[in-house]
A protein has these predicted regions:
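Conserved alpha-helical positions within TPR/SEL1-like repeat arrays
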Residues: 422-432, 456-467, 490-501, 524-535, ...
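Polytopic membrane enzymes that build or remodel cell-surface glycoconjugates and lipids
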Residues: 1-439, 443-445, 449-460, 467, ...
């Protein structure tokens, strides 16, 4: 085959890979953000939502936010927000584009190293379509996975370019790309090890193996190790910073909580569990709770690993791709296998995004070899490969759909796992946000059965109870949360809300102040304290609290609204109007802001504008008595008595015996020129 025809075949393969991958992941364009880290990465991160700014860039490079230093990932999320705002579907599609790019780069690198187009294409297709990779692609918070892998693949391509014709410029290009990858996610710490494996096969740079493309540039092991030292030098500070950031964020699990023995057992078992899910990808979940394994299970898993490793070493000279693929799989999982435990998961699908490439290489090269040994026709290999890819595509299509929103995601997780505290918690939070308080209560109760000493669970259950109007039960749960964790600022804040709802303003004020002593940057506590101060007539203090909330969280619509209320009560109508408008720009469906803006405009004799705001409030909430009353007043002042009467009557239907509405309606009836109406 000519070089030109090979090039066109490669183009055709790339087009097919891109189209099929895009088709499988196309549904994500309608998906939502989840409450599983997407809030920290995007929806509640003001630095990211501000787009690419100098201040944001400085923050990204100087702050180990959310337990990891990954400035390029933050910049990528910032750029998304600048281009698409909070359009979740667009953020998802960017992840898909990176996944497609990674797929094409993997094909390109393997094809260049091996000149085996179809086998390289098969590896790339498995990478693109395997269900275990859905988590890395369909989850916005895993931008770090697809972005760091993009630089991983570029580094490998640049390294192959360097090996073909070694010079300083090509080497520095590979080194620079590796450094960029580390700034997206420190998963690249194992890349020098993988480059050594590639030196063995398929590059054939050692005296123990032949090059896959027949070009042998033999180097000593010492030379190859020295060649990787600059890469290793990058990994050392990256590893230290990552460990420090995770420890600083409380993510590192200490040895007294999780002994070394349990970690080793989980690591050995997880290697085999990942293998099982690679070849039988069912029951996949966004979170796998930590489990204890018996010695029998651990020994069985160890025997599997030892058996495969022994077979690979035995066949290493005849089938070097087995050696490279297997050690790729084992080695790239080391940072995330749980020996240094970060978080409470026992394993995670996303951790396989890079490691599975090693297994795919083993399958892609071993399958044809086995069929040749068994004298099977070539079409058997083609049919087997096609069946595998179709199966992966179908399973991935189903798995993708679980990531549509919080409810679909965590209901699926609960269906395929047991005693999953995180799934109960996040599903409960999602139901709480939807106002499904009874269902949320059930989820938080289930969470407490699993983790009875969880202060956050008691706090969340209390929120659900408060939403059902069960104030006494909610207060008891907030108190339980604070007995377990007295410095839980959110529980103090929420307890303040419950007490304020009972009219216990002094006690509520004390709880808000307690929350702010613990967490001075809790904008919601500043805002809630302001509401209580307004109710106590302490307007100057309320204004100060609203302003404090807005310094922390400029897009907190409720703080703008309450600041408007405080200013209006001080007679600063123009300033109040500005705050109401600011609140409505952020949250256009805030009926209180529409109504109060209308009242402020009416006080400036801007009656037409005021009536427009009352009407806007009633379009959103037709049973809003205050807006009906204010609209009635405005209509009466315009002499539109019949319409005003209708609004007053509607007000009294919603709030019987409300004095202002009774007085307004009585005045109309008493002063009407129609005698029958007066009587």
């Amino acid at each position: 085959m000519t070089e030109t025809s090979q090039w066109w075949r490669s183009v055709f393969i790339c087009l097919c890979l891109a189209v099929v991958t895009a088709a499988v992941y196309w549904p994500v364009r309608h998906f939502e953000f989840t409450n599983y880290d997407d809030d920290v990465y995007v929806t509640e991160n003001p630095h990211v939502q501000g787009g690419v700014t100098l201040r944001g860039i400085v923050w990204a490079f100087t702050t180990p936010h959310f337990n990891m230093w990954m400035p390029l990932t933050w910049l990528s999320c910032m750029l998304d927000c600048q281009l698409f705002g909070l359009n979740a579907g667009a953020h998802h599609l960017v992840n898909v584009l990176f996944h497609i790019a990674n797929t094409l780069l993997l094909f390109t690198v393997l094809n260049r190293m091996t000149a085996a187009q179809w086998r390289s294409a098969f590896v790339a297709a498995l990478f693109a379509l395997h269900p275990l990779h859905v988590e890395s692609v369909a989850w916005v918070a895993e931008r770090k996975d697809v972005l760091s892998t993009f630089f991983w693949m570029l580094t490998m391509l640049a390294y192959v370019h360097y090996v073909e014709q070694p010079n300083g410029g090509r080497y520095l290009l590979a080194l620079g790309l590796c450094a960029l990858g580390l700034m997206a996610k420190p998963m690249l710490v194992t890349l020098p090890f993988v480059l050594l494996l590639l030196d063995y096969w398929p590059l054939g740079r050692t005296r123990w193996a032949q090059s896959a493309i027949g070009v042998r540039k033999e180097r000593s092991l010492g030379y190859l190790l020295r060649e990787k030292l600059p890469f290793i030098a990058l990994m050392i500070p990256a590893s230290i910073v990552t460990y420090w950031a995770e420890q600083r964020g409380g993510l590192i699990v200490l040895l007294d909580s999780l002994p070394v023995g349990m970690r080793v057992v989980n690591a050995v078992v997880s290697y085999v569990r990942y293998l099982g899910k690679a070849f039988w990808p069912v029951g996949l979940a966004a979170f796998y709770p930590y489990r204890t394994w018996s010695l029998v299970v651990m020994c069985g898993a160890g025997a599997v690993l030892a058996g495969v490793s022994g077979a690979v070493i035995w066949r290493a000279r005849r089938q070097p791709y087995l050696f490279t693929g297997w050690l790729w799989y084992l080695g790239t999982l080391v940072p995330v296998i749980g020996l240094v435990q970060a978080g409470t998961q026992s394993m995670a699908d996303r951790y396989t995004y890079i490691p599975l490439v090693g297994l795919f290489i083993m399958v892609a090269w071993c399958l044809p070899h086995s069929l040749v040994e068994q004298r099977k026709p070539r079409m058997v290999a083609v049919a087997t490969a096609a069946a595998l890819l179709v199966s992966c595509a179908v399973l991935t299509g189903f798995q993708v759909r679980h990531w549509k929103n919080n409810e679909t995601l965590f209901r699926h997780v609960l269906n395929v796992t047991k005693d999953n505290h995180l799934a109960h918690e996040n599903l409960g939070r999602a139901l709480l946000d939807q106002g499904k308080f009874a269902e949320a209560t059930a989820e938080f109760a289930a969470l407490l059965r699993i983790k009875p000493d969880s202060a956050n669970a008691h706090n969340s259950l209390a929120n659900a109870l408060a939403g059902q109007g069960k104030a006494a039960e909610a207060i008891a749960e907030y108190a339980a949360a604070l007995r377990i964790k007295p410095d839980l600022a959110e529980a103090h804040n929420n307890l303040g809300l419950a007490l304020a709802g009972q009219g216990k303003l002094a006690e509520a004020t004390a709880e808000y102040q307690a929350a702010l002593r613990i967490k001075p940057d809790l904008a919601e506590a500043h805002n809630n304290l302001a509401i209580t101060l307004i109710r106590q007539g302490r307007l100057a203090e309320a204004v100060a609290e609203c302003q404090a909330a807005l310094r922390i969280k400029p897009d907190l619509a409720e703080a703008h609204y309450n600041l408007g209320n405080a200013l209006a009560s001080q007679g600063k109508v123009a300033e109040a109007i500005a705050e109401y408008r600011a609140s409505l720009r952020i949250k256009p469906d805030n009926v209180g802001a529409h109504n109060n803006l209308g009242a402020a405009l009416a006080s400036q004799d801007k009656v037409a504008e005021a009536m427009g705001e009352y009407a806007a409030a009633l379009r959103i909430k037709p049973d809003y008595a205050d807006a009906h009353y204010n609209l009635g007043v405005a209509l009466a002042n315009q002499g539109r008595i019949a319409e005003a009467t209708t609004e007053y009557r509607e007000t009294l239907r919603l709030r019987p015996d409300w004095p202002p509405a009774l007085v307004g309606l009585a005045w109309i009836l008493a002063t009407s020129s129609n005698e029958s109406v007066r009587n």
